[in-house]
Amino acid sequence: MDSLIAALSAGQTYRSDWNKNALPTTAQVAGQWYDLSTGAGNPMMNSIIGSSANLAHQAITETTSITAASGALGGSIAGTVFTDTTHGSGRFTVGMALSGTGVVAGTYITSLGTGTGANAGGTYNVNISQTVTSQTITGTAVAGGLPHGGDVGALNKHLLNASAFSSATTTAPAIMMLYDMLACYTITSVTTTGAQSFTGQAAWARYADGSGVRAFLVPSVVMGAGSPTVQLSYTNSASVAGRLTPAAPSLPVINTTAPVGSIAYAGTGVGKYGPFLPMMAGDAGIKSVQSINFSATMTSGVMNLVICKPLAYMPITTVGVASERDFVNMLPSMPRIYDGACLHWAMYAGAATPVNSSFMGHIDTAWA
């Protein structure tokens, strides 16, 4: 406690206010989990999800960015429609910032048009109306994490307080979960069945031993009509390989036409879990992932396996009333925030939540 008081006295503290919107086109269903990192607001949308190569390991920190280099060799913007006529490399995703000669600063993709978010052409809707003639247009994806005070080197940073609330109708009850996003694997091969191996594996930059690390699936492009089961092969935090998502009582079942931002298998009933993919009995975390197996085609869409470390939970019990947590005096207390942490919120909808509902709050951190 003395070191905490000294840190506060020395100004080694940071307050970060946030405001995130829920799904922009689809109401949130009661009984399901949603990843608010894919929503607009402050911090900005996480467009890293869905941007990397198929099945490839993408490490994530608060400053991670991915550039679709020469993404559109023949790209143009008319009004609020960006057209990728002659595609170069990489893929365009919702939330990705666009740049090029004459492109207005701050332009980003708000939604898909005829473009699919895959390595192909098509149209995408943008936030600023403008006219840009055919040229090379580049897209840059960012992680959009909640600021927490920057790197502190040899010092230890901890979460002191947090709050969350919403004034939108029927946004309560809800449960908010703060997590650190460690890595992501974009899965564009959603019509492939059987085990698909991940590539470019590397240790998690934070929580390298895997203790407490979990995984969930979230679409970055709305999924098609398929509803397969899913099984993850992983190595646990005790370095035991060959662990599998348990088949009993049931493997997780992907929701048909799962929308962007939804935890793809969350809900109520057989095969519904949330927010995380179940682990085998006795496992305390995920050290690495080896493959993923879908039992049937999902027809279309882009799925993403997100690796994360959950840090804190808090309930929102009443619309317009803030939920607050004092992590200094609660046990277990003061979750550590590592350098490079990419903090995001997930939400469990206890009631049908209207389209584009706003959630807001803050966190306080300190380091000593």
Q: PLM ranges: what are they?
A:
Residues 95-98, 214-221, 341-350:
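Hydrophobic beta-strand segments within beta-rich accessory/binding domains
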Residues 1-67, 141-219:
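Extended assembly-interface regions of large multimeric machines
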Residues 66-145, 225-226, 234-334:
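Small/polar beta-strand repeat architecture
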Residues 149, 166-169, 220-227, 298-301, ...:
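Extended, low-complexity, turn-rich repeat/linker tracts enriched in Gly/Pro/Ser/Thr and Asp/Glu
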Residues 14, 18, 33-34, 49, ...:
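Sequence-level detector for tyrosine residue identity
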Residues 206-238:
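Aromatic- and glycine-enriched beta-alpha-beta binding-site module
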Residues 1-14, 18-22, 240, 302-368:
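C-terminal interaction-tip segments
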